[in-house]
């Protein structure tokens, strides 16, 4: 795999409606060109670490940012975040958690685990663009 298969953003979301809305926000922030969507937590980890159907994929090909829903099939977003932070290759990878509700205990837990940011769905374009820009993700600017 080479530059043509590089990915800027791994978007982990199982709800097709939320996928569509968030991809629109990414495009509005000039970040929608190289996005990989994973539909569950296991697929996200397989993509990151080159396992399963992504066997042979190298982490050097991206992503530079993970957008992570908390309520996922097969493995929760919290479990994915734990795996990402526990691995030396991904411990510093920016992760923004996206969720459709605010649960104070969950918010405390994701920050304890080292999340880079937290946004409530549906995404506010300006808030997302600002946070992505602060995390150093290129192209993160609003129209």
Residue ranges, per PLM feature:
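Alpha4 helix (beta4-alpha4-beta5 surface) of REC/receiver domains from two-component response regulators
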Residues: 4, 20-24, 79, 102-117, ...
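Residue-level signal for the "D+5" position in two-component response regulator receiver
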Residues: 37, 72-75
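Acidic catalytic/metal-coordinating carboxylates
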Residues: 40, 61, 76-82
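Short amphipathic alpha-helix used as the core "switch/output" element in two-component signaling
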Residues: 53-56, 78-91
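A Lys-centered signature of the CheY-like receiver
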Residues: 121
């Amino acid at each position: 795999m080479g530059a043509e298969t590089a990915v800027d953003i791994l978007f982990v979301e199982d709800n097709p409606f939320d996928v569509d809305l968030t991809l629109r926000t990414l495009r509005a922030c000039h970040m929608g060109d190289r996005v990989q969507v994973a539909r569950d937590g296991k697929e996200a980890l397989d993509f990151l670490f080159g396992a399963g159907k992504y066997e042979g994929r190298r982490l050097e090909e991206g992503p530079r940012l993970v957008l992570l829903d908390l309520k996922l099939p097969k493995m929760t977003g919290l479990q994915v975040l734990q795996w990402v932070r526990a691995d030396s290759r991904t411990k510093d990878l920016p992760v923004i958690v996206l969720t459709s509700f605010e649960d104070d205990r969950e918010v405390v837990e994701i920050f304890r685990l080292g999340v880079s940011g937290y946004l409530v769905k549906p995404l506010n374009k300006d808030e997302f663009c600002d946070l992505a820009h602060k995390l150093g993700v290129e192209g993160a600017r609003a129209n």
